[in-house]
From Swiss-Prot:
Keyword Nucleus in annotation: no
One example of a Gene Ontology biological process annotation: lipopolysaccharide core region biosynthetic process
Protein name: Lipopolysaccharide core biosynthesis protein WaaS
Gene label: waaS
Residues passing through the membrane, by range: none
Pathway(s) per entry: Bacterial outer membrane biogenesis; LPS core biosynthesis; Bacterial outer membrane biogenesis; LOS core biosynthesis
Entry keywords, A to Z: Lipopolysaccharide biosynthesis
Function noted in UniProt: Probably involved in the biosynthesis of the core oligosaccharide region of lipopolysaccharide (LPS). May be necessary for the attachment of a rhamnose to the LPS core by a linkage to the KdoII residue. May also play a role in a lipooligosaccharide (LOS) biosynthesis pathway.
Knockout consequences: Truncated protein interacts with other waa/rfa components and inhibits completion of the lipopolysaccharide outer core. Mutation of the gene results in changes in the LPS core but does not affect the attachment of O antigen in an E.coli strain producing the O antigen from S.dysenteriae.
Upper lineage: Bacteria, Pseudomonadati, Pseudomonadota, Gammaproteobacteria, Enterobacterales
A GO cellular component entry from the record: plasma membrane
Length: 311
């Protein structure tokens, strides 16, 4: 069985795939730009583009077998010629949700896949849907290479990285509270179409995932501000668990979950602001191996492979 990751291009995704290649027979295939360029041109004139998917399969996926697995994520499934590839290939097909999506998204894409894995566990009534935990891109064999001891910084360092997405006001307000309590801020809000106000925390471009890891490891506290309808765990939450950091978040679903501990999480909208200073200055214990494994790429890949072997 060969596992094909199709158009996974983010740097943290590539890091994960390289790790998984040590354990599984995996190929990472990216659609050449010329295919997407041609697809745009012929789509504008209403020309059928199924042939383009077949041509790509002939040149790049010609050796695929029916018991192999294609894995596509929600960020790319509706882009380029991915749908044409899925229509014209005979193998197991998986859609792996990494972001919050609506029911319409599921309905539009369900027929292209054998299984859709949902980390928020919101669509379990659909026969194509299976629950899976959100997963961290760094594997269990690699996490031990990082220093997970408490950072003895002269000032507690709070780290935020993410696109604006209309969150700048909340971030600015939190920054004021943290500064008042003596924290040093490493806040990086990437400008997007929602950015209308000026802020010293705005940056023009996203930083690399390796740099993100470096800053995360250097921090004492990570900040995670999510959309109102998001219920699953973000990458920031998983960073806090795997790198043994404290986390300030507005994700109320953390409270009462299996990952919750009062020493690790300060939940905006649940915890009193009066408790923030104590939280900042408290320590937190690392999670055990078995608890982390549930959110690892090792577990994710094992789950997917097992689901098809058992069929």
């Amino acid at each position: 069985m060969t596992i094909y990751f199709i158009n996974w291009v983010a740097d943290y995704e590539l890091k994960m795939i390289q790790y998984l290649k040590k354990k599984y027979k995996i190929k990472n295939i990216t659609t050449p730009k010329k295919y997407n360029w041609i697809n745009k041109k012929i789509s504008k004139i209403g020309m059928d583009n199924a042939w383009l998917g077949r041509l790509f399969i002939k040149h790049y996926l010609n050796d695929i077998k029916k018991d192999d697995i294609i894995i596509i994520n929600d960020s790319v499934v509706n882009k380029g010629i991915n749908k044409q590839i899925l229509k014209n290939i005979n193998c197991h097909k998986v859609l792996l949700l990494r972001n919050t999506v609506g029911e319409d998204f599921i309905l539009d894409n369900a027929n292209y896949f054998d299984i859709i894995y949902d980390f928020e566990h919101r669509f379990i009534g659909n026969e194509k849907i299976k629950a899976i935990e959100q997963f961290f891109p760094i594997g269990m064999d690699e996490i031990r290479n990082y220093s997970l001891s408490d950072k003895n910084n002269s000032q507690p360092i709070c780290f935020f990285l993410g696109r604006d997405k209309g969150r700048l006001q909340i971030i600015n307000e939190l920054a004021e509270r943290l500064t008042t309590l003596g924290c040093k801020l490493d806040f990086n809000v990437v400008k997007d179409k929602t950015s209308s106000t000026t802020s010293k925390y705005l940056i023009e471009k996203q930083i690399s995932y390796e740099e993100n890891i470096r800053r995360t490891l250097n921090a004492n506290i990570i900040v995670d501000i999510t959309k109102e309808n998001q219920s699953g765990w973000t990458l920031r939450i998983l960073e806090a668990l795997f790198f043994n950091k404290k986390l300030i978040t507005n994700n109320i679903n953390v409270f009462g979950s299996e990952i919750y501990s009062e020493s690790r999480f300060f939940i905006i909208g649940h915890d009193d602001w009066d408790k923030l200073e104590y939280f900042i200055n408290s320590s937190v214990k690392p999670m055990d191996y078995d608890s982390l494994y549930k959110f690892s790429p090792d577990k994710m890949m094992s789950t997917i492979v097992s689901d098809f072997i058992d069929k």
